[in-house]
Amino acid sequence: MEENKEFLLTQEGYDKLEEELENLKVVKRKEVAERIKVAISFGDLSENAEYDEAKKEQAQVEERILKLENMVRKAVIIDESKIDLNVVTIGSIVKVKDLEFDEEVEYTIVGSTEADPYDGKISNESPVGKALLGRAAKEVVEVQVPDGVAKFEILEIRR
């Protein structure tokens, strides 16, 4: 994990991180501690699979908590009211036309922490995200993809 990296987030993305962090601290920690307690009650810890599994889960939970705390501490929340609708920026919702397949697709450009391609949220660091940033409606962008070059026409930019 990069110690000095800022995490660009929308307010929605920040709220989700806060919610996950709270759940891990308040709910998951207690669940894992209870599982450890039960596993200890089984006796001999040297051959106690339940104990080993619970301790591994505890380590994973604590690692995730530390990671989320770092992300929340270094979060930079994008002020969506200040998004320039003339060019693509983080927080923009961009409708593009794939010129090869003649299909329209809509992407929300987000920081890498929030990226979820299945939900149409692509990272500003992804090949498509990078190509769209700073571009205006009606422009055609070319993106290097594994199969060659994809061409997209920017149809609309909104927030």
Swiss-Prot record:
The gene is greA. The keyword Transcription regulation applies. Residues 2-77 form a coiled coil. It comes from the Bacteria. NCBIfam families: greA, PRK00226.1-4. Keywords: Coiled coil, DNA-binding, Transcription, Transcription regulation. GO terms for molecular function: DNA binding; RNA polymerase binding. One of its GO terms (biological process) is DNA-templated transcription elongation. It holds the Pfam family GreA_GreB. The keyword Lipid metabolism does not apply. Belongs to the GreA/GreB family. This is Transcription elongation factor GreA. Necessary for efficient RNA polymerase transcription elongation past template-encoded arresting sites. The arresting sites in DNA have the property of trapping a certain fraction of elongating RNA polymerases that pass through, resulting in locked ternary complexes. Cleavage of the nascent transcript by cleavage factors such as GreA or GreB allows the resumption of elongation from the new 3'terminus. GreA releases sequences of 2 to 3 nucleotides.
